């Protein structure tokens, strides 16, 4: 039987290597995942319905695992493209980039934080050989007065603007394999009641580093005075992301 060619609309030969980046205007993740699963398992899964239930999510992961076993090349490309598309739409999947540890405790700080992904460029050969360079912009809009440490003040109507330059690389030792597709059922007792935790996970190990810089003189001077001072530089050699969260975001 002639093998079907899926993902042709992506023109992956040029998609992943054109100017060293992935093109951002890609669609059809859901349709192509459905085709890859059908090719691998012989089953036609309605992803839109399956993604709404626990059993359905488990089925998507186990079926995606089978797809990776049968067609690792196209499955890899699809998972990476889902990551890129979702990240560009604001589904970051990296908790540290939300600055929750810095901003949540400061409930008396009258500001609103805006975040935007300016670009997300990926160079790719395989799961064990990829790199990402991205830039995110953050704006702190102050609607109250704030008096902080080191004589830092912010007034109503003021703004602080920052750029975050992010670099991600594949993990040097931990490889992506069929074992990276994980479904776990864990039972435990909580106040004499049996509880169950379902874990749906497509694990990708990586390392990342970023630097945070002020866009203007005021923001640059204030950066080491406010609660973001611990976020000026950040690095993690042992980081995991869940690729399934990006599929969930894109499957409608």
Swiss-Prot record:
Record's bilayer topology term: Lipid-anchor
Localization, UniProt: Cell membrane
Highest taxon above the source species: Bacteria
Covalent lipidation (N-palmitoyl cysteine), chain numbering: 26
Pfam hit, one: Lipoprotein_3
Main location: membrane
A cellular component term, taken from the record's GO annotations: plasma membrane
Residues spanning the signal sequence: 1-25
Keywords of this entry: Cell membrane, Lipoprotein, Membrane, Palmitate, Signal
Family: Belongs to the MG439/MG440 family.
Protein name: Uncharacterized lipoprotein MPN_411
Organism listed in the record: Mycoplasma pneumoniae (strain ATCC 29342 / M129 / Subtype 1)
């Amino acid at each position: 039987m002639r093998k079907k060619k899926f993902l042709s609309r992506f023109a992956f030969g040029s998609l992943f290597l054109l100017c060293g980046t992935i093109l951002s205007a890609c669609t059809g993740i859901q349709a192509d995942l459905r085709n890859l699963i059908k090719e691998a398992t012989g089953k036609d899964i309605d992803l839109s319905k399956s993604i709404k239930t626990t059993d359905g999510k488990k089925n998507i992961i186990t079926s995606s695992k089978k797809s990776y076993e049968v067609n690792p090349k196209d499955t890899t490309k699809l998972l990476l493209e889902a990551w890129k598309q979702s990240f560009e739409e604001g589904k970051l999947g990296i908790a540290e980039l939300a600055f929750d540890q810095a901003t949540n405790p400061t409930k008396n700080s009258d500001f609103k934080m805006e975040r935007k992904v300016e670009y997300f460029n990926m160079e790719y050969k395989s799961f064990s050989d990829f790199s990402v360079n991205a830039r995110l912009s953050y704006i702190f809009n102050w609607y109250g007065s704030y008096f902080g440490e080191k004589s830092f003040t912010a007034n109503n109507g003021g703004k602080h603007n920052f750029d975050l330059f992010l670099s991600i690389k594949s993990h040097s030792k931990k490889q992506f394999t069929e074992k990276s597709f994980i479904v776990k059922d864990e039972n435990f007792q909580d106040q004499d009641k049996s509880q169950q935790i379902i874990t749906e996970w497509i694990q990708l190990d990586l390392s990342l580093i970023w630097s945070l810089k002020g866009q203007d003189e005021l923001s640059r001077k204030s950066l080491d005075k406010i609660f973001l001072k611990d976020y000026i530089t950040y690095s993690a050699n042992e980081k995991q992301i869940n690729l399934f969260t990006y599929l969930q975001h894109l499957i409608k």
